[in-house]
């Protein structure tokens, strides 16, 4: 447990050092204003950071990947398109089968050294975020294999989570204390 704590402290210090020198390129705010995702660039590396209710939740965390066709580990921000997205969907294997969402959808385009685009689509809601990578199809490329994913989740030491128990009740606690 002590080694894990030391490693987590080292990661937190590295993440904090990135925050000092990174330049914010885009911000995505949830419709209710509670969640903010900042996307930053530092020495051709892309990071995202999450604040919730004015408190830092996720320290700067790396984005990027390396595939058999393209290297998206060093990127330059190109553009962002944002829109509000609302809707409902059903899940047939869940306690809550009907789900609704109200998010800010942001499509960010990045370019690598070879001029190839990587698209990262964020969905930012009041209590959640999600993102996914898109690699635009070029030529006859039928499939792409991912060799390395650089995606990180550098949680702040004081970040809280909700841990439900079997009764549906639960507790809020920091990530280190649960």
Model region roles, listed by residue range:
Residues 17-22, 26:
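Boundary at the C-terminal end of the N-terminal hydrophobic targeting segment
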Residues 25-178:
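N-terminal accessory beta-strand-rich subdomains and adjacent acidic, glycine-rich linkers
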Residues 6-16:
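Bacterial N-terminal signal peptides
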Residues 1-3:
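Positively charged n-region of N-terminal signal peptides that target proteins for export
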């Amino acid at each position: 447990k002590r080694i894990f704590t030391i490693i987590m402290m080292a990661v937190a210090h590295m993440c904090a050092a990135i925050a000092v020198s990174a330049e914010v390129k885009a911000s995505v705010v949830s419709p209710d204003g509670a969640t903010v995702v900042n996307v930053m660039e530092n020495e051709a590396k892309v990071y995202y950071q999450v604040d919730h209710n004015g408190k830092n939740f996720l320290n700067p965390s790396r984005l990027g990947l390396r595939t058999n066709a393209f290297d998206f580990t060093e990127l330059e921000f190109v553009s962002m398109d944002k829109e509000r997205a609302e809707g409902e969907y059903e899940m047939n294997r869940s306690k809550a089968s009907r789900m609704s969402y109200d998010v800010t959808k942001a499509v960010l385009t990045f370019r690598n050294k070879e001029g190839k685009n990587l698209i990262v689509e964020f969905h930012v809601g009041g209590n959640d975020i999600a993102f996914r990578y898109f690699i635009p199809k070029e030529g006859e490329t039928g499939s792409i294999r991912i060799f390395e994913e650089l995606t990180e989740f550098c949680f702040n030491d004081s970040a809280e989570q909700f841990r439900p128990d079997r009764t549906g009740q639960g507790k809020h606690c920091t990530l280190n204390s649960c």
